[in-house]
């Protein structure tokens, strides 16, 4: 907060507002995209198992991104079991993946071609 005030107090208020306002706007857009839009795809159906998705991120980079994303790639678990802490989503998903597949829950895997639907046979 101090550097922002210093920039504004030094007479660079237009530049400071533009810089910090732009950074704020980018932050809001990224947060909305990652925490509201992506996790609720495909946005076409409603129902307990259908209105949010699970996005599987493979490998070590996937485990790191899952933690950075605060396990929101398992957002469907949050909707199914809101009292489960976010850091337990992946373990719970592993336990109920077959049930979710049987109920038609959307599960995607990140690939070089983007998000690809995961077949019911390979969901677990």
Predicted regions and their residues:
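Non-catalytic, topology-defining segments of multipass membrane proteins
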Residues: 1-22, 83-124
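Histidine-centered catalytic micro-motifs
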Residues: 36-41, 68-84
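Hydrophobic transmembrane alpha-helical segments that form the core helix bundle
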Residues: 1-66
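Alpha-helical membrane-embedding segments
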Residues: 52-65, 78-92
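A structural signal for well-ordered alpha-helical segments within the folded catalytic domains
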Residues: 28, 71, 87-90
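Residues that form generic nucleotide/phosphate-binding pockets
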Residues: 37, 67, 95, 99
């Amino acid at each position: 907060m101090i550097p922002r005030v210093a920039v504004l107090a030094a007479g660079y208020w237009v530049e400071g507002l533009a810089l910090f306002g732009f950074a704020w706007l980018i932050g809001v857009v990224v947060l909305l995209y990652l925490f509201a839009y992506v996790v609720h795809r495909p946005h076409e159906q409603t129902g307990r198992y259908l209105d949010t998705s699970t996005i599987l991120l493979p490998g070590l980079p996937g485990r790191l991104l899952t933690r950075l994303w605060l396990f929101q790639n398992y957002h469907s678990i949050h909707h199914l079991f809101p009292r489960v802490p976010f850091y337990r989503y992946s373990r719970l998903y592993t336990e109920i993946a077959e049930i979710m597949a049987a109920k038609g829950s959307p599960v995607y895997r990140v690939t070089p071609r983007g998000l690809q639907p995961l077949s019911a046979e390979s969901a677990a």
